[in-house]
Amino acid sequence: MALTAALKAQIAAWYKALQDQIPDFIPRAPQRQMIADVARTLAGEEGRHLAIEAPTGVGKTLSYLIPGIAIAREEQKTLVVSTANVALQDQIFSKDLPLLRKIIPDLRFTAAFGRGRYVCPRNLAALASSEPTQQDLLAFLDDELTPNNQEEQKRCARLKGDLDGYKWDGLRDHTDIAIDDDLWRRLSTDKASCLNRNCHYYRECPFFVARREIQEAEVVVANHALVMAAMESEAVLPEPKHLLLVLDEGHHLPDVARDALEMSAEITASWYRLQLDLFSKLVATCMEQFRPKTTPPLANPERLNAHCEEVYELIASLNAILNLYMPAAQEAEHRFAMGELPDEVMEICQRLAKLTETLRGLAESFLNDLSEKTGSHDIMRLHRVILQMNRALGMFEAQSKLWRLASMAQSSGAPVSKWATREIREGQLHVWFHCVGIRVSEQLERLLWCSVPHIIVTSATLRSLNSFSRLQEMSGLKEKAGDRFVALDSPFNHVEQGKLVIPQMRYEPTIDNEEQHIAEMAAYFREQLESKKHHGMLVLFASGRAMQRFLEHVADVRLLLLVQGDQPRYRLVELHRKRVESGERSVLVGLQSFAEGLDLKGELLTQVHIHKIAFPPIDSPVVITEGEWLKSLNRYPFEVQSLPSASFNLIQQVGRLIRSHACRGEVVIYDKRLLTKNYGQRLLNALPVFPIEQPAVPDVIVKPKAKPARRRRR
């Protein structure tokens, strides 16, 4: 489709009308360029897909929504906007699209949040009920569906009143009533515990109401995991050829795709025996009380017992083999080099893949049959069996995927990382098996790049070390296929708005010097805090261990610090805003997740402290396997893997400071390797251009760690 004059005029008119809706709107050349690039790509005028880096301040969300909606209407397609986190998804759904509706009055949009974000009305009814009989009936379905106390029951009753009165849409983030994680775990549900169409509450269930709205919507706001699953199953979203797809926070896409290729499951022999026995009894119950019209051959008791016995014997053999690789009777881990399993283990995995897939098929067959019996049997007993069969199906689905992945030598031309772990829980040993594909380009090519005609991949950060090469390698996007890669200029003047401070540290932040380095960092931070020049501060760490050591050094000012984990992130940010706006000092302290999606403008954040260059952990089985593979190809893991990842993290961390033209401040990085190592200049070159200062650090006396006493040999 060509971009007609009428279509261009429509996009221009909406953009002009938008300026009247936003106070202090500043027209920006990068934004106009992005609108044009997105329009040309989605209309098929230029290239296959577009990866476009839009720095903070460009206004990327509206830059893809305006042309996306216009072209979707012209082509009678659905615009799907996908994000990596709930916060951005909710911002687009609750803020950006309602704003556009003011200039596009008939705009129809909805959101497809994950099931776990919605309340389950069945669970809510049980927890809100003050009638013991009602609670007993629902507890028959699930033992946890009773309130812990009267206050919790009253809170649930208020939530139910809001839901029934259409004052609440059922999303956790859309109610002012406080819901702690434990309560929400019981209020929500997952696929395995959902009765689906068999549920009495199906028609008014917020999750299914939202799913039905997708069919009528022009714009659907989803998340990457849902989009990947939808492309795999061809469910939830319209057909790929009828989509226009925007992947915001697109740098997360390879990780999300990798998660779909990541399987972990318990394989402890005794636990497995229990699951197989429970499933056999469940099948017997179905045959006795809810006999299907056509009996699956495997439902025959003798055949099923023989099948389960073979599964158990294979699992027991695998446990015995894995125990040879790990120290006896203690927590341990064993990784298989390059993901290569011994022949005997590979044969077991291949056989288990077939056997567990057969059990998955049997569970699915019974579940489909049970779903058709709701009008002819005791509804409570039937629902209980449906729930149990649903959970069995989920377990065998996971096991089937695990053994199928374990049986693969490679995925997307790279090894599959494989390892086993042994944990001790309540005095009992538990064995787990894990598999992760380290490359996912073939999966993305099959599900996205070859299925959806035109896709926009965007983020404030897509490059590392000033290059798209890492994104290309991880995602499979390539110029040879007609994909375009564009990096927009920042609208901000970083030279005037901020500076980069690299204190003259005596120690490098290596593991051997961690104690001394953190003591120096704490001393400089304390000096900055006491100067009272900055009311809003952010401190970012590469590890939880380092963060805790830092907190020990500044324990006397702990009340000023809002630390990740103390409360949900949104509450910490809310409290930070209130403190700064009332003239108080406030310091947010967190890990890498606080370096993304945190938008604090002006006085809310004028100083960012970064503990060190955040290289990926060297003890991760996935990272180690990837390193082995790269070396086998005569590629240098530090250049291909570690340095690009560190550059990406540093760009995101530094990007927290300048969020608008009104922002002023400084970024403090406590890592002298930026100035002393050859790679340091490359990392600096990938950052916005700030003037650099190197102040002295206060003298610190650090007590050396006591070395453990050597045992005298006897």
Swiss-Prot record:
Name assigned to this protein: ATP-dependent DNA helicase DinG
Binding site for [4Fe-4S] cluster: C120, C194, C199, C205
Function, as annotated: DNA-dependent ATPase and 5'-3' DNA helicase. Unwinds D-loops, R-loops, forked DNA and G-quadruplex DNA.
Catalytic activity: Couples ATP hydrolysis with the unwinding of duplex DNA at the replication fork by translocating in the 5'-3' direction. This creates two antiparallel DNA single strands (ssDNA). The leading ssDNA polymer is the template for DNA polymerase III holoenzyme which synthesizes a continuous strand; ATP + H2O = ADP + phosphate + H(+)
Domain Helicase C-terminal intervals: 517-698
Keywords attached to this entry: 4Fe-4S, ATP-binding, DNA-binding, Helicase, Hydrolase, Iron, Iron-sulfur, Isomerase, Metal-binding, Nucleotide-binding
Chain span(s) of sequence motif DEAH box: 248-251
Organism: Salmonella paratyphi A (strain ATCC 9150 / SARB42)
